[in-house]
């Protein structure tokens, strides 16, 4: 029987997206968040390595995912040194970290949350009050 770590390590990157600007990722979510089941985003974690070029920082990737009710999970290193972050829609009643709860409150205050992102919060009983 394969362990969970073996499954994650061997998980294939099937749909790698590369963006140079956060607005491009947001546009992708606007067009695909309701229908796609997963994607992988080329990104960097803390400091932009030279080999990353103009790929997105982690914070931009995770914030846009939260805005649309998606979550980051598996992280893999690409052959060229960049990282690939797996994103997928949140499951109902999934666990929310305190950090992601705070991020959503901040995103709501900045006017970036979408109805899909709010619905994911509602489904998890973590309603953020907002003005319409």
Regions found by a protein language model. Give the residues of each.
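Charge-dense, helix-prone N-terminal extensions
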Residues: 4-132
């Amino acid at each position: 029987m394969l362990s969970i770590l073996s499954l994650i390590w061997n998980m294939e990157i099937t749909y790698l997206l590369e963006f140079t600007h956060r607005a491009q990722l947001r546009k992708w979510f606007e067009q695909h968040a309701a229908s796609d089941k997963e994607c992988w985003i080329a990104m960097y974690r803390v400091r932009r390595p030279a080999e990353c070029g103009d790929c997105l920082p982690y914070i931009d990737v995770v914030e846009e995912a939260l805005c649309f009710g998606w979550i980051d999970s598996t992280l893999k290193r690409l052959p060229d040194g960049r990282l690939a972050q797996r994103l997928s829609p949140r499951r109902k009643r999934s666990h929310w970290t305190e950090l992601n709860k705070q991020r959503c409150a901040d995103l709501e205050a900045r006017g970036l949350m979408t109805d899909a992102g709010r619905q994911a919060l509602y489904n998890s009983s973590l309603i953020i009050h907002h003005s319409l």
